[in-house]
Protein backbone atom coordinates (compact mmCIF):
# COMPACT_ATOMS: atom_id res chain seq x y z
CA UNK A 1 0.00 0.00 0.00
CA UNK A 2 1.37 3.43 -0.91
CA UNK A 3 0.26 6.46 1.06
CA UNK A 4 1.09 9.85 -0.39
CA UNK A 5 0.91 13.44 0.72
CA UNK A 6 1.45 16.17 -1.88
CA UNK A 7 2.62 13.44 -4.29
CA UNK A 8 5.35 12.31 -1.84
CA UNK A 9 5.43 8.76 -0.47
CA UNK A 10 5.05 8.54 3.31
CA UNK A 11 7.59 5.83 4.06
CA UNK A 12 6.20 5.07 7.54
CA UNK A 13 2.86 4.13 5.96
CA UNK A 14 4.09 2.12 2.96
CA UNK A 15 3.98 -1.62 3.64
CA UNK A 16 4.65 -5.02 2.13
CA UNK A 17 3.06 -7.48 4.56
CA UNK A 18 3.08 -11.23 3.89
CA UNK A 19 0.41 -13.29 5.64
CA UNK A 20 0.12 -17.05 5.16
CA UNK A 21 -2.40 -19.20 7.05
CA UNK A 22 -2.72 -22.95 6.54
CA UNK A 23 -5.15 -25.20 8.37
CA UNK A 24 -5.22 -28.99 8.06
CA UNK A 25 -8.17 -30.75 9.68
CA UNK A 26 -9.45 -34.25 10.34
CA UNK A 27 -12.99 -34.93 11.55
CA UNK A 28 -14.86 -38.00 12.66
CA UNK A 29 -18.36 -38.49 14.03
CA UNK A 30 -20.57 -41.28 15.28
CA UNK A 31 -24.33 -41.23 15.70
CA UNK A 32 -26.81 -43.68 17.10
CA UNK A 33 -30.51 -44.00 17.88
CA UNK A 34 -31.83 -46.00 20.82
CA UNK A 35 -35.52 -45.81 21.54
CA UNK A 36 -36.64 -42.22 21.95
CA UNK A 37 -33.03 -41.09 22.29
CA UNK A 38 -30.62 -40.24 19.52
CA UNK A 39 -27.16 -38.85 19.81
CA UNK A 40 -24.06 -37.90 17.93
CA UNK A 41 -20.49 -37.27 19.05
CA UNK A 42 -17.72 -35.83 16.95
CA UNK A 43 -14.08 -34.96 17.21
CA UNK A 44 -12.16 -32.58 14.96
CA UNK A 45 -8.42 -32.12 15.06
CA UNK A 46 -6.80 -29.09 13.44
CA UNK A 47 -3.19 -28.14 12.86
CA UNK A 48 -2.73 -24.44 12.14
CA UNK A 49 0.31 -22.66 10.77
CA UNK A 50 0.35 -18.85 10.52
CA UNK A 51 3.39 -16.98 9.20
CA UNK A 52 3.57 -13.19 9.01
CA UNK A 53 6.38 -10.96 7.80
CA UNK A 54 6.63 -7.20 7.33
CA UNK A 55 9.29 -6.36 4.73
CA UNK A 56 11.69 -3.59 5.62
CA UNK A 57 11.39 -4.12 9.37
CA UNK A 58 12.01 -7.85 9.65
CA UNK A 59 9.03 -7.95 12.01
CA UNK A 60 6.94 -11.10 11.85
CA UNK A 61 5.72 -14.14 13.66
CA UNK A 62 5.38 -17.88 13.25
CA UNK A 63 2.57 -19.66 15.06
CA UNK A 64 1.94 -23.40 15.04
CA UNK A 65 -0.74 -25.04 17.11
CA UNK A 66 -2.66 -28.30 17.28
CA UNK A 67 -6.22 -28.24 18.62
CA UNK A 68 -8.91 -30.80 19.36
CA UNK A 69 -12.59 -29.83 19.16
CA UNK A 70 -15.16 -32.24 20.60
CA UNK A 71 -18.90 -31.99 19.90
CA UNK A 72 -21.88 -33.83 21.31
CA UNK A 73 -25.65 -33.77 20.74
CA UNK A 74 -28.32 -35.71 22.60
CA UNK A 75 -31.96 -35.67 21.45
CA UNK A 76 -35.02 -37.02 23.21
CA UNK A 77 -38.34 -37.34 21.36
CA UNK A 78 -41.19 -36.40 23.68
CA UNK A 79 -43.74 -37.10 20.93
CA UNK A 80 -43.59 -37.48 17.16
CA UNK A 81 -43.44 -33.69 16.77
CA UNK A 82 -41.77 -32.54 20.02
CA UNK A 83 -38.09 -32.96 20.93
CA UNK A 84 -35.63 -31.68 23.48
CA UNK A 85 -31.96 -31.44 22.65
CA UNK A 86 -28.78 -30.82 24.63
CA UNK A 87 -25.51 -30.03 22.89
CA UNK A 88 -21.90 -29.07 23.50
CA UNK A 89 -19.30 -27.82 21.01
CA UNK A 90 -15.81 -26.38 21.30
CA UNK A 91 -15.03 -23.76 18.64
CA UNK A 92 -12.17 -21.58 17.43
CA UNK A 93 -12.11 -18.11 15.90
CA UNK A 94 -8.73 -17.14 14.50
CA UNK A 95 -7.62 -13.51 14.26
CA UNK A 96 -8.02 -12.10 10.76
CA UNK A 97 -5.34 -10.56 8.57
CA UNK A 98 -6.18 -6.94 9.49
CA UNK A 99 -5.83 -7.65 13.21
CA UNK A 100 -2.40 -9.24 12.74
CA UNK A 101 -0.80 -6.76 10.29
CA UNK A 102 1.85 -5.01 12.46
CA UNK A 103 1.96 -1.70 10.60
CA UNK A 104 0.25 1.53 11.61
CA UNK A 105 -2.81 2.96 9.91
CA UNK A 106 -4.81 6.06 10.67
CA UNK A 107 -8.02 7.97 10.02
CA UNK A 108 -6.52 11.21 11.24
CA UNK A 109 -3.28 12.38 12.85
CA UNK A 110 -4.56 11.75 16.41
CA UNK A 111 -5.76 8.13 16.12
CA UNK A 112 -3.20 5.49 15.12
CA UNK A 113 -4.09 1.78 14.82
CA UNK A 114 -1.51 -1.02 14.79
CA UNK A 115 -2.06 -4.75 14.27
CA UNK A 116 -0.61 -7.48 16.48
CA UNK A 117 1.08 -10.46 14.76
CA UNK A 118 1.20 -12.35 18.09
CA UNK A 119 -2.58 -12.60 18.55
CA UNK A 120 -3.88 -16.01 19.57
CA UNK A 121 -7.22 -17.49 18.51
CA UNK A 122 -10.35 -17.19 20.61
CA UNK A 123 -11.64 -20.52 21.98
CA UNK A 124 -15.31 -20.95 22.87
CA UNK A 125 -17.11 -23.71 24.76
CA UNK A 126 -20.78 -23.62 23.76
CA UNK A 127 -23.59 -25.31 25.72
CA UNK A 128 -27.19 -25.34 24.44
CA UNK A 129 -30.53 -26.74 25.56
CA UNK A 130 -33.38 -26.66 23.02
CA UNK A 131 -37.04 -27.48 22.62
CA UNK A 132 -38.11 -28.23 19.04
CA UNK A 133 -41.57 -28.67 17.55
CA UNK A 134 -42.06 -29.84 13.97
CA UNK A 135 -45.15 -29.70 11.81
CA UNK A 136 -45.95 -30.24 8.16
CA UNK A 137 -45.13 -26.70 7.05
CA UNK A 138 -42.29 -25.74 9.38
CA UNK A 139 -40.88 -25.85 12.89
CA UNK A 140 -40.14 -23.77 15.95
CA UNK A 141 -36.94 -23.92 18.00
CA UNK A 142 -36.55 -22.41 21.48
CA UNK A 143 -32.94 -22.48 22.73
CA UNK A 144 -31.17 -21.41 25.91
CA UNK A 145 -27.39 -21.12 25.58
CA UNK A 146 -24.19 -20.36 27.48
CA UNK A 147 -20.88 -19.63 25.73
CA UNK A 148 -17.55 -19.27 27.54
CA UNK A 149 -14.70 -17.77 25.49
CA UNK A 150 -11.02 -17.40 26.39
CA UNK A 151 -8.27 -15.23 24.87
CA UNK A 152 -10.92 -12.77 23.71
CA UNK A 153 -9.51 -10.10 21.37
CA UNK A 154 -10.11 -6.51 22.48
CA UNK A 155 -8.64 -3.24 21.29
CA UNK A 156 -6.28 -1.77 23.87
CA UNK A 157 -5.76 2.00 23.59
CA UNK A 158 -2.87 4.02 25.02
CA UNK A 159 -2.86 7.81 24.96
CA UNK A 160 0.49 9.55 24.65
CA UNK A 161 0.19 13.31 24.57
CA UNK A 162 -2.83 14.00 22.39
CA UNK A 163 -2.43 10.88 20.22
CA UNK A 164 -4.35 7.60 20.78
CA UNK A 165 -2.59 4.36 19.83
CA UNK A 166 -4.86 1.29 19.49
CA UNK A 167 -3.75 -2.32 19.15
CA UNK A 168 -5.70 -5.60 19.45
CA UNK A 169 -4.69 -7.85 22.36
CA UNK A 170 -5.86 -11.17 23.77
CA UNK A 171 -7.48 -9.85 26.89
CA UNK A 172 -9.52 -11.99 29.23
CA UNK A 173 -12.68 -14.04 28.97
CA UNK A 174 -16.26 -13.59 27.85
CA UNK A 175 -19.36 -15.30 29.19
CA UNK A 176 -22.47 -14.99 27.03
CA UNK A 177 -25.94 -16.19 27.97
CA UNK A 178 -28.99 -16.00 25.81
CA UNK A 179 -32.31 -17.21 24.55
CA UNK A 180 -33.22 -17.74 20.90
CA UNK A 181 -36.61 -18.34 19.37
CA UNK A 182 -36.65 -19.33 15.70
CA UNK A 183 -39.74 -20.15 13.66
CA UNK A 184 -39.43 -21.52 10.15
CA UNK A 185 -42.44 -21.88 7.90
CA UNK A 186 -42.77 -22.90 4.30
Predicted segments, located by residue:
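Outer-membrane beta-barrel proteins
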Residues: 17, 55-65, 116-120, 170-172
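Outer-membrane beta-barrel pore domains and translocons
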Residues: 33, 44-48, 75, 89-91, ...
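Surface-exposed extracellular loop regions of Gram-negative outer-membrane beta-barrel proteins
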Residues: 21-58, 65-71, 80-126, 146-169
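Outer membrane beta-barrel strand-and-loop segments of large Gram-negative receptors
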Residues: 10-14, 20-23, 120, 135, ...
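Outer-membrane beta-barrel channels and translocator barrels
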Residues: 34-37, 77-81, 124, 134-138, ...
Amino acid sequence: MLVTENDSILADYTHDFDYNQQVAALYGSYGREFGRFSGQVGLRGEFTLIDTYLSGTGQGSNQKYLDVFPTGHLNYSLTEIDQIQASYARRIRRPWYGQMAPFSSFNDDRNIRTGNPDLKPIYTDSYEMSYLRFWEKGNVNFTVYYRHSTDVIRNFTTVIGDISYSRPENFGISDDYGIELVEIGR
